[in-house]
Amino acid sequence: MVRRIFVEKKPAFAVKAKELKNEMSEYLGIEAEDVRVLIRYDIENVGDETYEKAKGTVFSEPPVDDLYEETFPCKEGDFCFTVEYLPGQFDQRADSAEQCVCLLNDAEHPIIKSATTYVISGVKSGKWKVESEWQEAVVKHCVNPVDSRRADGPKPATLEDRFD
C-alpha cells in the first residue's frame, strides 16, 4: 500500500515559498497573494508503527512543519502543480528518508519517492492576458527539464520500478 504525505513549512519558516514568490515577481512579472511549497512523500513497505514514528521524526519537524496525509488544504482557484525527478535520476531526499526509516526498523525495506508541490494563490494577471500563460511560465520556471518533470497524476498503486 502506498501512503502519501505532504509536508509544508509553517509560514514563519517558509523560506523557499517566499523566495519563489519574489522570483515570480522579479523575473516573470507575476504578482501572487500567496505561494506555498510542500514536499510530497510517497511511501511503501512501511508498517503502521514505523510509519507513525517516521511522520514526526523522518518526514517532518513538528515545531516548524505542518504534515498532511493523502491530501492538503487548498482554496478553489489555487493553481497547484507537482514536480518530480525523472526516472533514474537520483533523489537524495527520498534516499535519506529511506535510510532513516531503516534506522527506525531495520526489518523493513521502504520504498520512498519525493516530489515538490507548488500552490499559487491570488494571481493578478498584469502583463499576462490568459491565465494559462502565466501558469505555463511558472511551471517552466520551476521545472528543470534536465532532471525533473511535471507530475500531477494520481497516486501510484506501487512505487516499485518496473522495466518492460
PLM features per residue range, with description:
Residues 1-164:
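Core nucleic-acid recognition elements
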